[in-house]
Structure formats: structure tokens, C-alpha cells
């Protein structure tokens, strides 16, 4: 499998920036691993179909594989307990703005 590059949404970049330095380092390391093996994350279903989730400690990295551009789109990062609800809310707000 070819190597991928990462691309971050503004929301994901902002959330990573606000994390504790140790957690931020672990998230960045996990993303580097995903660039080599992007299928390591779990496929999401229903309204989140097309996205994948990767667990690192108590956090989730939500991303999309873009094979055409050899890119991983990092969509969202957050604590496991509410990451999917927050992501659904964000996606719904984006659809309403369109």
C-alpha cells in the first residue's frame, strides 16, 4: 500500500492544538501510523458512513481515506465518551449552512 499524506479540517486542527502536550504527541504519532496503514481504523456506519475511527487512549481520531489524492482527511478528534455525538452535531450544522 502506498504512503499517504495528512490533511486536517479546521475543526480537527483546532481540537488537536488545544490538547495536553502528551496527548497531542500521542495523537500525532497515531496519525503517522495511520498514514502507513490507513485501514487500521474501524469503518463507521449510518450517517457517518465513509469515515473511519481510530482509538488512541481515551480519544478517537475520525478520518476519511481519499485514495485519489493519497490523503487521509483528519475530520475530527475528541474524547471517546462524546466524539460521535459532537461529530454528528458538527456535520448537521455544516449541512444546514450549505
Write out the residue ranges for each language-model feature:
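Arg/Lys-rich, positively charged N-terminal/basic patches that mediate binding to nucleic acids
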Residues: 1-25
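Enriched for short, Lys/Arg-rich terminal
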Residues: 2-5, 64-98
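Enrichment for repetitive, rod-forming helical segments
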Residues: 22-24, 31, 59-62, 87-88
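Short proline/glycine- and basic residue-enriched helix-capping loop/turn segments at helix->loop/beta transitions
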Residues: 33-37
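Basic/aromatic recognition patch in beta-strand/loop cores that engages polyanionic ligands
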Residues: 39-82
Amino acid at each position: 500500500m502506498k504512503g499517504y499524506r495528512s490533511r486536517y479540517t479546521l475543526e480537527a486542527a483546532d481540537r488537536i492544538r488545544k490538547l495536553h502536550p502528551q496527548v497531542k504527541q500521542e495523537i500525532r504519532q497515531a496519525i503517522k501510523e495511520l498514514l502507513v496503514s490507513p485501514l487500521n481504523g474501524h469503518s463507521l456506519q449510518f450517517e457517518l458512513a465513509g469515515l473511519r475511527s481510530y482509538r488512541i487512549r481515551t480519544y478517537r481520531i475520525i478520518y476519511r481515506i481519499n485514495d485519489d489524492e493519497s490523503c487521509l482527511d483528519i475530520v475530527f478528534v475528541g474524547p471517546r465518551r462524546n466524539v460521535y455525538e459532537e461529530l454528528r452535531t458538527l456535520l448537521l450544522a455544516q449541512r444546514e449552512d450549505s
